[in-house]
């Protein structure tokens, strides 16, 4: 599986992970937590409530929120504020995966982020090293910003 995009099944698993009390709802605090982990949390809880219009989301609303807020109608990635400069949005996404801030994404960092996002089993099963190698055009064993940007823009 390629980590260059989040599928609907991935979102369903995220929802299930976020829904700690298994009531079928994700609260705004839980939504802010995942947005923060993805590097897209730029709103206060009150601002997010104004955007969402309620205190919690069911699965369908969660999926709709993701697709409306994170993806445009053509499916291209954008951040919550729909910044005009794609590099800024891509840099924020890159920084989610560049855990140690050295400017490179390693297989270990990819695995760590997947686990933080609730994909513990998948992180163990997926070959994160292979995923890095697929996008590592300069063959240094890491994905740098330009390689990440190229991956994002050509998904």
Swiss-Prot record:
PROSITE patterns: EF_HAND_1 (PS00018), EF_HAND_2 (PS50222)
UniProt key word Transcription regulation: no
InterPro entries in alphabetical order: EF-hand-dom_pair, EF_Hand_1_Ca_BS, EF_hand_dom, EF_hand_pair_protein_CML-like
GO molecular function, one term: calcium ion binding
Domain EF-hand: 6-41, 85-120, 130-155
Keywords associated with the record: Calcium, Metal-binding, Repeat
Cited CDD domains: EFh (cd00051)
Binding site for Ca(2+) 1: 19, 21, 23, 30
Chain sites annotated for binding Ca(2+) 2: 98, 100, 102, 104, 109
Keyword RNA-binding: no
Gene3D superfamilies for the chain: EF-hand (1.10.238.10)
SUPFAM superfamilies cross-referenced by the UniProt entry: EF-hand
GO process annotations (BP): cellular response to hypoxia
Role: Potential calcium sensor.
Name assigned to this protein: Probable calcium-binding protein CML44
Source species of the chain: Arabidopsis thaliana
Gene this chain is encoded by: CML44
């Amino acid at each position: 599986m390629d980590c260059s995009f989040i599928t609907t099944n991935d979102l369903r698993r995220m929802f299930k992970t976020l829904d700690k009390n298994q009531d079928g709802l994700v609260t705004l605090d839980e939504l802010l937590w995942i947005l923060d982990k993805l590097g897209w949390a730029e709103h206060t809880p009150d601002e997010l409530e104004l955007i969402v219009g309620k205190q919690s989301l069911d699965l369908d609303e969660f999926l709709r929120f993701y697709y409306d807020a994170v993806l445009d109608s053509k499916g291209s990635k954008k951040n919550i504020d729909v910044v005009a400069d794609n590099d800024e949005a891509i840099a924020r996404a890159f920084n989610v995966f560049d855990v140690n801030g050295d400017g490179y994404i390693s297989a270990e960092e990819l695995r760590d982020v997947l686990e933080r996002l609730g994909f513990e089993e998948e992180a163990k099963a997926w070959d994160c090293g292979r995923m890095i190698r697929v996008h590592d055009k300069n063959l240094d064993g890491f994905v740098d910003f330009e390689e990440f940007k190229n991956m994002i823009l050509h998904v």
